[in-house]
Amino acid sequence: MNPVVDILSLDHEGHGVARLDGKVTFVDGALAGERAEIAIFRKHAKYNSANAVAILAPSAQRAEPRCRYFGRCGGCSMQHLEPSAQVAAKQRVLEENLARIGKVRPSVLLPALHGPSWGYRGRARLSVRRVEKKGGVLVGFHEKRSSFIADMASCEVLAPGVSALIQPLRELIGRLSNADRIPQIEVAAGEHVIVLVFRLLEPWNDDDAAHVRAFADAHHVQVWEQRKGPETARPFWPDIAPELSYGLPEFGLVMPFRPTEFTQVNSAINRALVSRALRLLDPRPGERIADLFCGLGNFTLPIAHRGADVLGIEGSTELVARARENALRNALPHARFEVDNLFEMTPEKFAALGPFDKLLIDPPRSGAIEVVKSLPEAGAPRRIVYVSCDPATLARDAEVLVHVKGYRLEAAGVANMFPHTAHVESIALFER
């Protein structure tokens, strides 16, 4: 007989947390305040992992998942929780990490940045596999806790134009002679363009190429092919096509990019996040500002648009070349860019860059610990805006900024970049 537990809270991955015979048990599919019948699928020394078999007393915040693949597909984990409650849970994750890891609390909690809950995702990496037992080729995300690919024909969080391609892609690849040599497809949607980058372990033959060209024409998409690393990606069809781009209309900017270059998956939240970052940073003419981990200039160019002299630093040579091109195309001579490995920052290297009035930091999940440890004791930037995709590393870096470098955590809040997932995007303001 399956045990019944009361769900006490949600963990940072969106699992229900219960106690069973004194042992912490993480319950997939259960919400705080619910009573659930569970089935344990893995026992560890200090905790159990379980699935909710039946919800005996549902939470008022429980929602009916919109996606028919929810529960099997691993792309989403929180569709069963009402959207506003998802955001509240992410805000709690941010606050708990700041308090527990960073030993800091923000003076102000910023209101969460919201956007569309469905059809928001313009970027995805779709796995491909021929599975005859499932009727042919599968294209989509992996199943939950599995290397298998979910049997899906659409996706509710992908942009509608991208979601509508999943079933046609399954049919296309099923007709190709090298279907077993296409492990994945990278999808990138701009404001008016969709690009599909096929990862190819062997090239298409003439018949395959004809099928792919016909598919691209019929579905109004561009097809690229990638033989090895991302740098090998190149256009396949059509020969002449408009470039990918996204806009930051508040600043009058158009940002072209290659499909293999990093951009945020959620364009609406990206616009809101850039707007908030600029309000918090408040760049002014004559100020000298650094944008670290600048990518293709997502924050750098809006800062330059406000008249500040801004130096963007990024470890990728390709992204810096793109950022320089974007600055030129948007007529922003106040934006300069350099290539440097910010994970190897030292106080000496930071001092050589010259003094900065303000700093914007937007690192990957690993954070920016070497940068914050390298800030000078005297003459440090008086204001830092930190954009984070991992609250744990933000909290770790905040501890150094506040307790070692003398900054105050003035404000922090979340941006719901990935609705229906446990991913927490956040932004924080530090001042001294």
UniProtKB/Swiss-Prot annotation:
It catalyses: uridine(1939) in 23S rRNA + S-adenosyl-L-methionine = 5-methyluridine(1939) in 23S rRNA + S-adenosyl-L-homocysteine + H(+). Pfam families: TRAM (PF01938), tRNA_U5-meth_tr (PF05958). GO terms for molecular function: 4 iron, 4 sulfur cluster binding; iron ion binding; RNA binding; rRNA (uridine-C5-)-methyltransferase activity. It comes from the Bacteria. PROSITE patterns: SAM_MT_RNA_M5U, TRAM, TRMA_1. Disulfide bonds: none annotated. [4Fe-4S] cluster binds at residues 67, 73, 76, 155. Residues 1-54 form the TRAM domain. The keyword Glycoprotein does not apply. SUPFAM superfamilies: Nucleic acid-binding proteins, S-adenosyl-L-methionine-dependent methyltransferases. Keywords: 4Fe-4S, Iron, Iron-sulfur, Metal-binding, Methyltransferase, rRNA processing, S-adenosyl-L-methionine, Transferase. One of its GO terms (biological process) is rRNA base methylation. Its EC number is 2.1.1.190. The keyword Methyltransferase applies. The active site is at residue 389. InterPro entries: 23S_rRNA_MeTrfase_RlmD (IPR001566), MeTrfase_TrmA_AS (IPR030390), NA-bd_OB-fold (IPR012340), SAM-dependent_MTases_sf (IPR029063), TRAM_dom (IPR002792), U5_MeTrfase_fam (IPR010280). S-adenosyl-L-methionine binds at residues 264, 293, 298, 314, 341, 362. HAMAP family: 23SrRNA_methyltr_RlmD. Catalyzes the formation of 5-methyl-uridine at position 1939 (m5U1939) in 23S rRNA. Belongs to the class I-like SAM-binding methyltransferase superfamily. RNA M5U methyltransferase family. RlmD subfamily. This is 23S rRNA (uracil(1939)-C(5))-methyltransferase RlmD. It comes from Thiobacillus denitrificans (strain ATCC 25259 / T1). The lineage of its organism: Bacteria, Pseudomonadati, Pseudomonadota, Betaproteobacteria, Nitrosomonadales.
